[in-house]
A protein has these predicted regions:
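A generic structural signal for short, solvent-exposed coil/turn residues
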Residues: 1-8, 48-50, 55-57, 69-71, ...
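N-terminal membrane-targeting/pre-transmembrane regions
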Residues: 1-31, 109-110, 135, 152-155
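A membrane-cytosol interface segment of integral membrane proteins
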Residues: 3, 107-155
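A short, polar/proline- and glycine-enriched secondary-structure boundary/capping micro-motif
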Residues: 14-15, 74-77, 131, 139-142
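Charged, low-complexity, helix/coiled-coil-prone segments
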Residues: 21-30, 57-59, 79-90
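Hydrophobic alpha-helical transmembrane segments
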Residues: 30-41
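Conserved beta-hairpin
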Residues: 42-84
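Non-transmembrane, membrane-adjacent beta-strand/coil modules in membrane-associated proteins
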Residues: 66-126
Length: 155
C-alpha cells in the first residue's frame, strides 16, 4: 500500500497578486514603449507558480517528498531516521515565515497551502514539517509503516 498526495498553490490572494503583476508587466512605460524583460517575467511567473507542486508518497521504505520544480527527484526520510510522526495544526506565517520551502525556529517546512501538516522528528534532533490537506491519513499511514519497520528490525 501507499499514501500519496499532490498539492498546488491555490490561495486566491496569491493568484490575484500574480495576475495583477502580469497585467502591470504589459503596460507601456513613460516612453510609451514596452519593457520586454517585464513582459517575459510577467508571463513566466504565473507559469512557474502553476507548475509548482508538493508531492508526497509514503510507503514501506519511508516518507518521500518532492517540491517540484526545486527538487528534480524525490527526497526520502527513511524509517530508521525517524523517531516520531504526528499530525499537526500550525501557523505557517508565524512559525515558518509563510509557504514554500521554509526554515523557521521550529525546523524546516515544505508547504504550499493551509495550516495542517505532518511533523517528522528525526534521530538527529531536527524536525521537518510537510504540509498536507490529508494530514490525519498521512500521519496514520506513516505511523503504521514506522511501527512495522520497528517490529521487523527487532527480530
Amino acid at each position: 500500500m501507499i499514501f500519496q498526495e499532490k498539492q498546488k498553490f491555490v490561495q486566491w490572494w496569491l493568484w490575484l497578486i500574480i495576475f495583477t503583476l502580469t497585467v502591470i508587466s504589459f503596460m507601456p512605460n513613460e516612453n510609451n514603449s514596452f519593457n520586454y524583460v517585464y513582459i517575459l517575467f510577467g508571463c513566466l511567473i504565473p507559469i512557474f507558480f502553476y507548475l509548482m507542486e508538493l508531492r508526497i508518497k509514503v510507503d514501506n521504505i519511508g516518507i518521500h517528498y518532492q517540491f517540484y520544480p526545486f527538487h528534480i527527484k524525490y527526497n526520502t526520510f527513511f524509517y530508521n531516521e525517524i523517531t516520531k510522526i504526528e499530525a499537526v495544526m500550525y501557523k505557517p506565517i508565524l512559525e515558518y515565515g509563510g509557504w514554500g520551502i521554509k526554515q523557521g525556529f521550529k525546523g524546516k517546512a515544505y508547504n504550499v497551502n493551509g495550516k495542517y501538516g505532518v511533523k517528522i522528528y528525526l534521530n538527529s534532533g531536527k524536525n521537518v514539517l510537510i504540509g498536507s490537506q490529508k494530514h490525519i491519513d498521512f500521519a496514520v499511514f506513516a505511523n503504521n509503516e514506522l511501527k512495522n519497520h520497528l517490529i521487523v528490525n527487532k527480530k
